[in-house]
A protein has these predicted regions:
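Cell-envelope and extracellular/periplasmic
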Residues: 71-74, 101-106, 110
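Active-site segments of SGNH/GDSL-like serine hydrolases
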Residues: 100-106, 125-158
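Charged helix-capping and loop-helix junction motifs
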Residues: 114-123, 154-162
Length: 218
């Protein structure tokens, strides 16, 4: 366990070291918002554009009503989230962190990365959360079957990553939230009612996700 934690912390430190020439992990995005957090949130949602857009599209003020803080950044991959995990999650002292990540890694936003390494970055965030008294919730990646580039076939990669995450939760007593199963269509993608572009949820899609997530925050 100590070796795993050391590797996770070393990985995060290495990512931070890469920021010397610029704000690669976008620490600045939530710098002021983090200062304005006056009490520990029930949960922080860590993620990419799916999480980033959630507060703007959610009906009924889901975030404020449940003391949830969103820390998604559009376009980010798991290594960037790992680099800013302390600043945007641990420093806020939440009870829970829900990690929804991996779509942009599969899309190769920062270049090719094996599914095993995407999984490893997510596990590193989980281990760091646990070591700091924050309860991690691993979220399945949402369905995706529209290729960003012709050579990328996302559907089988999403399914493989989700299988790895589900197996990890089963062996490590970590909470797991399955968005994939109730939202996937018969082509392993998101139907139009849940995502007009096949990736980013509609208000109806977010409403489904909220009903799935809330029971895990108990």
């Amino acid at each position: 366990m100590k070796k795993i934690l050391f590797a996770a912390i070393l990985s995060a430190f290495s990512c931070a070291a890469a920021l010397a020439a610029g704000d690669w992990a976008n620490f600045g995005r939530y710098a002021e918002a983090n200062k304005a957090v006056s009490k520990p949130p029930l949960a922080v949602l860590m993620g990419d554009s799916i999480t980033d857009a959630w507060p703007k599209k959610t009906p009924g003020d889901f975030f404020a009503k449940n003391n949830i803080v969103g820390r998604g950044i559009s376009g980010q991959v798991t290594s960037q989230m790992l680099a800013r995990f302390r600043r945007d999650v641990l420093d806020l002292k939440p009870k829970y962190v829900a990690i929804l990540a991996g779509t942009n890694d599969i899309a190769q936003n920062q270049g090719y990365i094996a599914v095993e390494n995407i999984f490893g970055n997510i596990v590193s965030m989980v281990e760091i959360a646990k070591a700091n008294g924050v309860i991690p919730i691993v979220c399945s990646v949402l369905p995706a079957n529209n290729p960003w580039r012709q050579e990328i076939k996302p559907a089988p990669l999403v399914k493989k990553l989700n299988e790895m995450l589900k197996a990890y939760y089963g062996k490590n007593a970590v909470k797991y939230v399955d968005y994939y199963t109730p939202m996937a269509d018969d082509k392993d993608g998101l139907p139009k009612k849940y995502a007009n572009d096949g990736i980013h949820p509609t208000p109806e899609g977010y409403a489904v996700m909220e009903k799935i997530l809330l029971p895990a925050l108990k």
